[in-house]
Amino acid sequence: MELKRVVVTGLGALTPIGNTIQEYWEGLSTGKSGCAPITYFDAEKFKTKFACELKNFNALDFFDRKEARKLDRFAQYALVASDEAINDAGLDLDTIDKFRVGVIWGAGIGGLETFQNEVINFANGDGTPRFNPFFIPKMIADIAPGNISIKHGFMGPNYTTVSACASSANAMIDALNYIRLGHCDVIVTGGSEAAVTQAGMGGFNAMHALSTRNDDPQGASRPFDATRDGFVLGEGAGALILEEYEHAKARGATIYAEVVGGGMSSDAYHMTAPHPDGIGVERVMLNCLRDAGMKAEDVDHINTHGTSTPLGDVAELKAITKVFGAHAKNININSTKSMTGHLLGAAGAIESIASILAMKHSLVPPTINHSVVDENIDPSFNLTLNKAQEKEIKVAMSNTFGFGGHNACVLFRKIEA
């Protein structure tokens, strides 16, 4: 059978550098850092005392008090970002066939704050099991797409992909394939995460995964810099409306880009460390290109996973060298995590959005905070250091990798109106 074409017709973002798509792009294009000392709790005794929190987000601006209490922050973020994307796409919810609209969402952790607080309350009690009746439905990762579908009446496929930091990229690839195969007309996809909590910070600190640059929070996320010392935890959500091309054209939708391919692979190497030679990462990019029917030379821009970890950044660039060869020096490579921090399960969504907006505006956002050259990194790479660069982008790639060796890659193509 002939596969259907899939396009992006709506975007929504709730990030540490902007609470809407417009604000997010302004932050990206100007090299804004979303990192600051933690305000959600007293982090004085933590090894890392900073994170990329949302700024000026008040749940009561979007939900009544009763509704807000029933939702963990990760689900609140999902509803807010998906609403923006649905509105941006101009979907007519009164006439659309809701049996052919799905919600496929990504969350690596889900309701961590809810889980943490309920366990603390129980531990501080007398052993009597007094739990909030909303404990489980607030915590489970699948509640985010469930609530999106309940709010809008979408009755197509509805589930959450859980693959650590690759979660929302996997969700997008599933959404792509459902539409390509003709099973849906529209899918709301993306991801959300809210792990800036005592448990989140403490857990990642125990793994020695986070930067401890407490004297310079804004400069802590520094992908590809020789002095990088771990990732910075972020939070938020990204939402994309994926739609069958002819369906989008028929209703006169504005099209941001075409989703032309998705690839997945596994490192099969270690629980948390990447394969040092980037074998799984090499394979996922090759799989994505093959799925799209495109050549390495077609790619103009790569938004890397680029977490600012000593091992991960080098392994990814090794893989890029293997896949793209001499063409690698022609590609604008960046890591927007230098600005947003690492949104875990939402990373693939917000970074895909960054790639799509870079394509739209012909401007590649910078990799900020770079000051010391890493001798293990080929100097011929254009890592878009410290300042945005103008670039005509016809094809953009977004890489996302997760603990457990999960690798996902999504490819977007500019589509002429």
Segments (PLM) and residue ranges:
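ACP-dependent fatty acid/polyketide chain-elongation machinery
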Residues: M1-E67, E246-Y256, I353-I368, R413-A417
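Flexible, low-complexity linker/loop segments at domain and module junctions
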Residues: M1-V8, D97-K98, A292-D298, K329, ...
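Condensing-enzyme catalytic core mediating Claisen C-C bond formation in acyl metabolism
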Residues: R5-T9, A36, D215-A292, H301, ...
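Conserved beta-ketoacyl condensing-enzyme motif
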Residues: V8, E23-Y24, S29-S163, S192-M201, ...
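A glycine- and small-aliphatic-rich helix-loop capping segment at beta-alpha/alpha-beta transitions
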Residues: Q22-G27, E113-T128, Y178-L181, M201-N214, ...
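Active-site-proximal alpha-helical scaffold in enzymes
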Residues: A78-L91, A144-P145, S149-H152, N158-E193, ...
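Glycine-/small-residue-rich "gating" segment that lines the acyl/pantetheine channel
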Residues: G125-N132, I173, N177, E193-A250, ...
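Acyl-CoA/ACP chain-elongation machinery
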Residues: H183-D229, G262-P276, G306-D313, N330-F381
